[in-house]
Every structure is written in C-alpha cells, then in structure tokens.
Design a protein with these regions (language model features):
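Structural motif corresponding to alpha-helix initiation and N-cap regions
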Residues: 18-22, 50-53, 76-80, 107, ...
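Active-site neighborhood of phospho(di)ester-bond hydrolases with catalytic His/Asp-centered motifs
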Residues: 2-4, 37-40, 69-71, 95, ...
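Short, flexible/disordered intra-domain loops and linkers
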Residues: 13-17, 45-47, 133-145, 229-230
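Catalytic pocket-lining loop regions of alpha/beta-barrel enzymes
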Residues: 93, 106-215
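Mid-to-C-terminal alpha-helical segments outside catalytic/metal-binding sites
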Residues: 2-13, 17-35, 84, 204, ...
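Alpha-helical scaffolding segments of alpha/beta enzyme cores, especially the outer helices
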Residues: 23-26, 54-58, 81-85, 111-119, ...
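Active-site gating/metal-coordination segments in enzymes
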Residues: 34, 47-132
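Active-site environment of divalent metal-dependent phosphoester hydrolases
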Residues: 9-11, 43-46, 75-78, 101, ...
Length: 259
C-alpha cells in the first residue's frame, strides 16, 4: 500500500520533528506501507516551484521507496516542458495548489494542467488543507480547496486521474454527489481527515460511495501516521473486508516517457 500524502522539508509556520526522507522511510516500514508519494513541504508557499522540485528530487536520491510528487504551476513560464521533464525523471504524481495561487474553480490554467497530466498518464494531486483552521498560522492566508475546484476538474472529460487529500466528509459528499457516475470514477480520496468512531464518518462513506474510491494517505509529518490505520481497524467487520485502492495502480512506472 502506498501513502499518497507524505512530505519532507521544513514547514514555514512551525517546527516539525525530523521531516527527512530517512525518517519517513522508517515510519512507512513501521506502518506496513511499501512506499509513498512525497511532496516538498515549502513548495505551496513559493512562487516558483522549480527550486523546491530540485530540492525534492535531490533529497529522495537513494530512497527507492519514496517517489517524488513535484509541483507544476500552470501559470508559470515553461510549465509544459517542466511537466514533461518531471514525468521522465520519475514523478509519481503532479501536485497543484490552486488556492495558494489564487486560481478559481474554473481557472483555464488548472484545466490545461489537468489535461496535460491526463495526456502524460500521471495523476494530478490536490491538497484541501495542511492544518485545521483553529491552529493555522495567521500568515497562512490560503483557504481550503473547494468542492467546486474538484468538480470542475472531474468534469473535463479526459481520462483524468485526480487524487484529493485532506478532505472531510462534508466536502467529499458535496463533490461526489454533484458528479455523474463516470465523473466520480475519476476522483480518489484519502481519509486522513475523515472521522472514525464515534461519528463513524468513514464507515458511512464506505457504505455510500464505496471503499474503492479511497487511497491511503498519512499527511506525515503534519499528522500522526497511526490515524489512518486506526480508522481502518475500527471499521465494522463487514466493512474491513472492503479493500481501498492502492495508489500504485494509478501511477506509471519510473522513467516512462509521456505520450
């Protein structure tokens, strides 16, 4: 099982203990995970994603279980060439942060990025939030990703693979039930921010939208890696047998040339 929502690097708003690839590998082994799609934590707050991407690839050298999930900003010069190069270098997914870049739900730039990712057969990964509003720094002014952003990309119609991390039950249901069945199949969600017992939001969603719509994400080092595993273990017995999707089935092999 792959963790789709892990990060390395310093967090701009508070100190995090050991946000390093070697520590992440040990954490994944402890949790019984085979690898992770890894982002560079400072990147959402940097205008130019290129330096952060280079730092990410450099840091992950020698860590074969950690695959880079770099950032492509579709309003930045040369972004298409950058996307092709990142895919060839082995990017497992492409991250985008429309809320941090001031892009609305129907941004033409985000549409172009989604189409380019579909053409390159690489998942597009969106993050709803990094921290709860109650603990978010006043300097972090970006709002949470909206359901309208997710629906707009899912409705494009191309063979898009969209992975959304950090959503709660409300945003997930607002998005999912506003899509056609075909559009729903283009979106996968992690469940790190979805409540288990006693609210049992995860069990409800497994029953209503299906376990196969979910992938595994920890949001390390911002959140405890034990939370997703505990939520799965605390599901009712009849739901524990329903398997979530392994995100490794959504990404292509390292070094594939984009079509």
């Amino acid at each position: 099982m792959i963790d789709v929502a892990a990060f390395i690097g310093p967090y701009p708003f508070r100190a995090l203990p050991h946000p390093e690839p070697g520590v992440l590998e040990r954490v994944l082994q402890r949790e019984g995970l085979s690898g992770a799609w890894v982002g560079y934590l400072p990147s959402p707050w940097q205008r130019d994603p290129a330096p952060g991407n280079e730092a990410l690839f450099h840091a992950l050298e020698g860590h074969s279980s950690l695959r880079p999930a770099p950032v492509v900003r579709p309003d930045w010069p040369g972004w298409r060439e950058a996307l092709d190069q990142l895919v060839v270098r082995g990017a497992a997914a492409i991250r985008a942060y429309p809320m941090h870049w001031g892009m609305g739900p129907h941004s033409p730039a985000m549409r172009e990025l989604a189409l380019a990712c579909a053409e390159a057969a690489v998942p597009l990964l969106l993050t709803v939030r990094f921290e709860d509003l109650r603990q978010r720094s006043a300097l972090d002014t970006a709002g949470d990703l909206t359901a309208a952003h997710v629906r707009a990309i899912a409705r494009i119609g191309a063979p898009i693979k969209l992975v959304v991390t950090g959503a709660g039950r409300e945003l997930l249901e607002e998005t999912h039930w506003g899509l056609t069945p075909d559009e729903q199949q283009r979106v996968h969600w992690d469940f790190a921010w979805i409540w288990g017992p006693p609210e049992d939001h995860l069990a409800h969603l497994f029953r209503t939208i299906g376990a196969e719509r979910f992938v595994y994400g920890t949001h390390w080092p911002l959140r405890l890696t034990q939370n997703p595993r505990a939520n799965l273990d605390l599901l009712p017995a009849e739901l524990r047998a329903r398997g979530i999707t392994d995100a490794s089935s959504l990404a292509f092999s390292v070094g594939k040339t984009p079509t």
